[in-house]
């Protein structure tokens, strides 16, 4: 729906002044693309998996939206929903970690920064973990690590292919060494999954950085990424200051990493489900309907 059509529907029979004026995004009906500046009717944007129809920019989406885009309707069965983070170090910077947790849980409706569960993609059973950047920047703490590890172990036991959707700033500093240990714990579980001969694919979305990049995000049999996703370990400014040289403009993008062999395929969000299904079938995974 175009801006003109929307005004026509809303104000039939009324004089409309300043028709070309951009609508207020604050009303929740419109979204402005940060890439091309196009103002899009929000319902149209959501119906296109939050991808700009004008320039292809991938807007950030939360874990619930991500699951809806990826899996068959009503097929997702969540796991370990009761797990909740604590504050073992009594950490406090400008604010107490416990207060940050409570506020973030209230604003997002999540207990921590990842949702895990079993699902189907075009009828093919799969294990799925989806990180949510809204929860403290998608940072990886003890609960995130535990939930992903448990999911990997279930996938290994049931011989299920596994997809982890990465969206994270890295390890959660408020949990110190406990958060860093999740890198090794998840990596160990993934190695056992690999030894069992089962497919694992990480999907790198914007942004995937820090300890997540340094562990399970780069351990896949096939590494997928969304277009123009920021992927890296340290930040661009830190690297430039360390090397004392200017980095390429597209440095740490999905396209740059694919060009240099770190990413196998860049898949537009609107094609993800069909692409996943094709890859799963290519690796011998069958749908429940076909197998029955």
From Swiss-Prot:
Co-factor binding details: Binds 1 zinc ion per subunit.
A Pfam family per the record: Carboxyl_trans
GO-annotated biological processes: fatty acid biosynthetic process; malonyl-CoA biosynthetic process
Span of the signal peptide: none
Keywords in alphabetical order: ATP-binding, Cytoplasm, Fatty acid biosynthesis, Fatty acid metabolism, Lipid biosynthesis, Lipid metabolism, Metal-binding, Nucleotide-binding, Transferase, Zinc, Zinc-finger
Sites where the protein binds Zn(2+): 33, 36, 52, 55
Cited SUPFAM superfamilies: ClpP/crotonase
Domain CoA carboxyltransferase N-terminal: 29-292
Gene3D superfamilies (UniProt xref): 2-enoyl-CoA Hydratase, Chain A, domain 1
Function, as annotated: Component of the acetyl coenzyme A carboxylase (ACC) complex. Biotin carboxylase (BC) catalyzes the carboxylation of biotin on its carrier protein (BCCP) and then the CO(2) group is transferred by the transcarboxylase to acetyl-CoA to form malonyl-CoA.
Protein name per its UniProtKB record: Acetyl-coenzyme A carboxylase carboxyl transferase subunit beta
